C-alpha cells in the first residue's frame, strides 16, 4: 500500500483533444514552477498513474516514459503538437500514394490467388510509417521499466481500439511487486 495518495491523469482520445491536453499540461508545469520553484518543479511527474486512449495514449506513454522529467516531457509534447502535420502520420506524397495504391491493386486483382498476398495484405490505405517514426522518437519505451522500478511512476495504461473489428485492448504496466519504496 502507498503511504501518500497518488494522483492519476486520464487522457481521452481524439487529435484535437490531445493537443488541448498538452496546453493543460503546460499550464500545470507552469503552476508547479511558480509553486515549487523552477528547480524542483522540473523533476518527477505529479501524476503517479497515467491512463490514455487513442491519441491520449500517445501523450500518456510519452509522459510515462519521461516521468522523471515532467517539464521536459511536456515541452517535447508541446513541440510535436504545435507543429503537427498530416505528413507526420502518413505518407501523402505521390510516391507514397502510388506505392500504397499498387499494393492494394495487386492484392485486390490477383492477391487472392497468391497465398503470400493473403497473409501480407496492406493494413492501411496510406503508408503510416511516419507515425511509427514519430512514436519511436516521442515514446522511448525502453525507459518505462526504469521509471516504474525507480517509482517515478506507479502505473501506465493505454487503450487501443480496432477500426475494423471494434474490439478494445488495454495494455498496462505497474510497479513490480516487491519493489522497495
Segments (PLM) and residue ranges:
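Active-site gating loop/helix substructures
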Residues: 132, 149-181
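Patatin-like phospholipase
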Residues: 2-8, 16-129, 133-135, 172-181
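Residue-level detector of functional hotspots within protein domains
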Residues: 10, 36, 43, 142-144, ...
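Short polar catalytic/cofactor-binding loops
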Residues: 12-16, 164
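Surface cap/lid and interfacial helix-loop subdomains adjacent to catalytic sites
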Residues: 124-155
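Glycine-rich, flexible loop/turn motifs
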Residues: 104, 121-122, 140, 165-167
Amino acid at each position: 500500500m502507498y503511504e501518500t495518495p497518488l494522483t492519476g491523469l486520464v487522457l481521452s482520445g481524439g487529435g484535437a483533444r490531445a493537443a488541448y491536453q498538452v496546453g493543460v499540461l503546460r499550464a500545470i508545469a507552469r503552476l508547479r514552477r511558480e509553486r515549487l520553484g523552477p528547480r524542483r518543479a522540473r523533476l518527477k511527474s505529479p501524476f503517479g498513474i497515467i491512463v490514455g486512449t487513442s491519441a491520449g495514449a500517445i501523450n500518456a506513454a510519452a509522459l510515462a516514459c519521461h516521468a522523471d522529467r515532467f517539464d521536459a516531457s511536456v515541452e517535447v509534447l508541446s513541440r510535436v503538437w504545435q507543429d503537427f502535420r498530416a505528413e507526420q502520420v502518413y505518407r501523402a506524397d505521390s510516391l507514397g500514394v502510388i506505392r500504397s495504391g499498387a499494393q492494394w491493386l495487386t492484392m485486390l486483382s490477383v492477391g487472392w490467388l497468391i497465398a503470400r498476398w493473403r497473409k501480407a495484405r496492406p493494413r492501411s490505405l496510406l503508408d503510416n510509417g511516419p507515425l511509427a517514426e514519430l512514436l519511436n522518437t516521442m515514446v522511448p519505451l525502453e525507459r518505462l521499466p526504469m521509471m516504474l522500478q525507480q517509482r517515478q511512476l506507479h502505473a501506465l495504461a493505454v487503450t487501443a481500439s480496432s477500426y475494423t473489428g471494434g474490439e478494445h485492448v488495454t495494455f498496462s504496466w505497474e510497479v513490480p511487486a516487491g519493489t522497495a519504496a
